[in-house]
């Protein structure tokens, strides 16, 4: 399997190099993106959160056009203040889905964990997060908000 992965990476013009005796390999995916995707791509950032991916893409590409979608209002407002002057970034306070609707969205103490999915009580993951944020498992969901959901196809037709 390792040889196959190395062969595929080599086909893209990159070489895997050992970084330790324990046979770990280092691949710089930023370089892979920069060299194999056009210089000014159109990027859809689904779940923009606070704009971490936008910052990464701005560092990798010259002038990417980024359409970011973030349904959590506080995170959207943060991104808006950060990127409002960049004409190549289109921020959308909306979620994407398979149909246009209003849907309940679980807002968590760590907003990048917020989701349409229900949080499963009693899991190790939830116990750790609750402890990290000084709350109970039930308290980890800070609110449930109705958010607008649209289909990507509809967004592209309109924009």
Which residues does each predicted region cover?
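Phosphate/nucleotide-binding beta-alpha loop and adjacent structural elements of enzyme active sites
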Residues: 2-159
